[in-house]
Amino acid sequence: MSQQNRRVQQNTAAFPLLTAHDILECLAALDIPAQMEDLTKPTAQSTQSIYGSLLEVLMGASINSIEGPKQALLGMMEYKEMYSDTLQFMMFFKHCRRLALLCGIPDFAISDLARPDANRLRKVLSGIMNFAKFRDERMQTQARFQENLQKHQKKAVDLRRKTEELETQFQEITARNAAERPQSEQAQKRNELLKSELLELNSQRLKEVQEYEELKKERQTLLEQVNHNNRIVTQLELQIGSAKSRLVQSPDRIKRHISEMSFAIQSEKAKLASFQQKARELTNRLEVIGALEVDLRGLIDLEHSIQDQRAKTEEAKRSKSALEARLEGRQIESQGLAAKLEQLQRQLQNASHKLARQEETRKGMRERGARRIDELKAEYKVRARERGEWQKQRDDLLAEQKELESEMAAFVTKHENEINEFLHAYWTMRRQAEDYMNTMTVKLGLQVQL
């Protein structure tokens, strides 16, 4: 690309260009050693060292991570010693180009590594520093999301504990109901006996009321007869008094009449006494009937209270059945959620193990890369003296470069697919965790505010 085109793209960059001093400060903040000369008068070695450190800090791709794929590719090629350095350089360029694309620099070329320019290096590093600042800002958001995830996991543990407490309460209620079932059955039998006895008493009450009404009528009749007899006795007494006051010629007739009247009076008095005795008996019977009425009202009230208690018992049974059905549904739902949570935890554990293995592999590759760098530095000093001979082979290498680039593209694509699969598995697991937390929120009536 010409210098003029690069100036045009520099003017239309999507990020601000930093000064060399600002770039040095940013590199120092990332613990990347660099001097002002490395920016104003860059060399291929210093530039590649800066880019390598940036790859390791920002993308976790160190020189060691290149060594393994490089050895795998060299295993499929002939003349390994001839292609080793070139292959490593091309793989390093591929990583740098990917970082540049992420930072909004689409025109990153091999010349930026092999023949670096100060202005060009300043532009690329400005874009990368802008990306690093953006990454630091988003790391806070990611930490906040991680904290929210931990809170949700804690809530899930609390909900699981509450579910276990509900199960314990349900078991206690079931055991208490089982213990109280004999008493309930006895009370129900007693209620049935009381009900049958109450029905008998009610029928007896109806008979007593009917008999009471008949006795009242008979008492009223007897009272009327007593009053009538009293009036007759009074009239007879008046007649006797008037008869005694008169003198008659026939004392025998008067005596006979008097004896008849006395006999009639005695019979009437005896009848009156019998009526009074019967009236007293009727009064006693009425008192007994009144007491029976009071007892009957008490039994009726007892029947009403028993019916109310029975209605409450039926309502309690229905509430208990509804609670048991609801608790059973919650238990089934809790078991499903627990199984889903265990599955997510297993997936997270597998991903953690896979990440740990990759971290160990990356660490080992970094150590091998460091040793390889030392070897390459020593070899570079030797090869610097042999550069003239290598220059003759440059044309042959350029002819084979296309084939090598195709093989490298296939290799990079393969590893990109592995990374994409890992990222896809991570986001799938995260979506499943979010779905699980949303399900817990909806089912248990919680409202989570992030």
From Swiss-Prot:
It is found in: Nucleus; Chromosome, Centromere, Kinetochore. Gene3D superfamilies: Ncd80 complex, Nuf2 subunit (1.10.418.60). One of its GO terms (biological process) is attachment of mitotic spindle microtubules to kinetochore. It holds the Pfam family Nuf2_DHR10-like. One of its GO terms (molecular function) is microtubule binding. Component of the NDC80 complex, which consists of at least NDC80, NUF2 and SPC25. PANTHER family: KINETOCHORE PROTEIN NUF2, MEMBRALIN/KINETOCHORE PROTEIN NUF2. Belongs to the NUF2 family. This is Probable kinetochore protein NUF2. It comes from Cryptococcus neoformans var. neoformans serotype D (strain JEC21 / ATCC MYA-565).
